[in-house]
Amino acid sequence: MASRQSRQQHTTSAPAASRTQTETSTPSQEQPPQDPTPEVRSQPAILRLRGVRASSGPSVRWAEGVVDNEGLGRKSSKVCCIYHPTKPVGESSDESSSDSSSDSGTDSDDSTRGKGKRKHRSGGGGGGKKHGEGDCHGHNHGHDHGSSSSSGGGGGARKKKKKRTPSPNAYEKMPKVKPRAPAPEGAPGASGQ
């Protein structure tokens, strides 16, 4: 052996289930090279591992305009009852005129939908009834639809609108079924069945 090397080990402990070990080699005795070509030493490879960063907060951030429409003191991404904020009587609704069929405009229009299966409040405020008592959408999941006149849910404070033709909302629309065109004879996936 031309040179002897001693190895020292340094062990560093990290939290919980990770461990780092570093080896440092130092030559104890050095001899001059006998070859005219310099000796090529390879540096030991360094592997640095970094743990996953812990999330610093909630992954969902609600916009300022998101409303707690279930009255439970929390905001939710679950869509049960679509909330449309009330507008002052004189305010223009140009930006929402294109989607007027999806507005929850008047209570009387809603009562004509769904082949009479649903019962809706008619007229002004009234204490919010629980779902499943025959009003709203006919599903029971334990929250009030408080339609007091202060929240704008009542129909008595609204100006008379032109009655629109009833059209199903997004939850009532059935998807259009496209008829399948027969595949050409030589096309992949075409079979004689």
From Swiss-Prot:
Gene Ontology MF terms in the entry: protein phosphatase 1 binding; protein serine/threonine phosphatase inhibitor activity
Region named Disordered: 1-193
Subcellular locations according to the entry: Nucleus
Cross-referenced InterPro entries: PPI_Ypi1
Residue ranges with Polar residues bias: 1-19
The keyword Nucleus appears for this protein: yes
Low complexity bias: start-end ranges: 20-32, 183-193
Residues forming coiled coils: none
GO CC annotation, single: nucleus
Keyword set, alphabetical order: Nucleus
Database matches in Pfam families: PPI_Ypi1
Major site of localization recorded for this protein: nucleus
UniProt key word Nucleus: yes
PANTHER family on file: E3 UBIQUITIN-PROTEIN LIGASE PPP1R11 (PTHR20835:SF0), E3 UBIQUITIN-PROTEIN LIGASE PPP1R11-RELATED (PTHR20835)
Family of the protein in this entry: Belongs to the YPI1 family.
Known role: Regulator of type 1 phosphatases which maintains protein phosphatase activity under strict control.
UniProt name for this protein: Type 1 phosphatases regulator YPI1
Gene that this polypeptide is encoded by: YPI1
